[in-house]
Structures are given as C-alpha cells and as structure tokens.
Amino acid sequence: MYKVMMLPMAEEDIMNNTDYIAFEKKAPETALELAMGFRNTIAKIEFMPKQHELDEDEELAAREIRKGYYKNYKIYFFIDERSSTVYVLRVLHMLVNAKPLLLNMRL
C-alpha cells in the first residue's frame, strides 16, 4: 500500500472546481458530491496506483505521470517507489490543456 500526498496545487484545483459548481452554477449539493467523489477516488489510488495508465502524451509519460478519472476530471499523479508515496499533482477538467501545467511542476 502506498501513502498518498496531495500537492497544494491539487488541493487548490479541488477547491476551484467545487467552488465553480457551488457558486457559478449555483449547485452546492453537486459541489459537495464532487468534492467527496474526488477524495474517494484519490483515496483508492493508494492500493494499486500502477493500474492507472500513464498519460498519453509522450513527455508526460516519460516523467511517469499517471492519471485517474472522476466524472469529467482527470487526477494526475506521480509514484515515488523509493518512499512508496503517490503524489497527486493536479485535478483538472478534461477540457483543460494539462500538459503545460504539469511540465512546469518540479517532480
């Protein structure tokens, strides 16, 4: 089993995504459900993180960035085998071009 660490940007992504649903779309119940769904999906990564595919982008895959899915969102993460830790990097809507955001991160 792996330890899961959320990077600050991933936490901020979850807040931004749920705030948008709650306040812009005026659906606070849906936002709460979304937040809980993100947390549950991320918690499950600790058991078998390698079952998730590497990103289809060659540069991201070369950096061993993997992704999981929840609804219309991708959860990007990196596995550090030395410490048995999964680092959740970003939680982004599928329409967001994640590549520049992920390549600018220090791994």
PLM regions: where:
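Basic, Lys/Arg-enriched alpha-helical interface segments
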Residues: 1-64
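Enriched for short, Lys/Arg-rich terminal
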Residues: 70-107
